[in-house]
A protein has these predicted regions:
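Bacterial N-terminal signal peptides that target proteins for export
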Residues: 1-9
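C-terminal motif of bacterial Sec signal peptides marking the signal peptidase cleavage site
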Residues: 16-19
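Periplasmic/extracellular electron-transfer cofactor-ligation site
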Residues: 24-26, 40-41, 47-77, 102-110, ...
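Short microdomains enriched in Cys/His and/or Lys/Arg
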Residues: 75-88
């Protein structure tokens, strides 16, 4: 059996799922230059912001802490890679924004919140910058994930 068959089937499944569901959301709006939700300008802004506020923990190229997958002695998790090699793509856009604004749950990690430091535009630029490292296959899988996990607060706004 061809070793690539499971990957090909998974990719096909992702593409099929991408075609299902609700109308396009924010992350699905495509920039003509990047083909992604963000533009080149955001990536260019995000690099220096990431270098200033994030690289000390997540690495200069968003590679994360060495052995990011092993708990620290205090039971918390080290900073994970954000470059598409770990689980960042398992978080929808609203959750990535929230994590940067509010920081991690103190029981799980040491990440501080940046709501008082970074504007919403800078937060989006940081996300654009690290997502620019993601392979197209990872980005496509993330789009499906993002579409299937809408921001719960957006549902509340419609009920008010």
């Amino acid at each position: 059996m061809n070793q690539r068959l499971p990957f090909a089937l998974a990719a096909l499944g992702i593409l099929v799922l991408a075609g299902c569901g609700d109308p396009p959301r924010e992350a699905e709006h495509r920039d003509s230059d990047t083909g992604r939700w963000y533009g080149v300008e955001q990536v260019m802004l995000g690099g220096p912001v990431f270098a200033t506020h994030c690289a000390a923990c997540h690495g200069a190229r968003a590679e994360g802490a060495e052995e990011w997958f092993r708990r620290l002695p205090d039971g918390r998790w080290p900073p994970p890679p954000l470059n598409g090699t770990a689980h960042a793509w398992h978080h929808p856009l609203w959750q990535l924004r929230q994590q940067i604004r509010e920081g991690s749950d103190p029981e799980h990690g040491n990440m501080p919140g940046f709501a008082a430091v970074l504007s919403d535009a800078e937060i989006d630029a940081v996300i654009a910058w690290f997502q620019s490292f993601w392979l197209d296959e990872i980005y496509a899988a993330w789009l499906v994930y993002d579409a299937n996990f809408p921001d719960p607060s957006s549902h509340q706004k419609g009920l008010e």
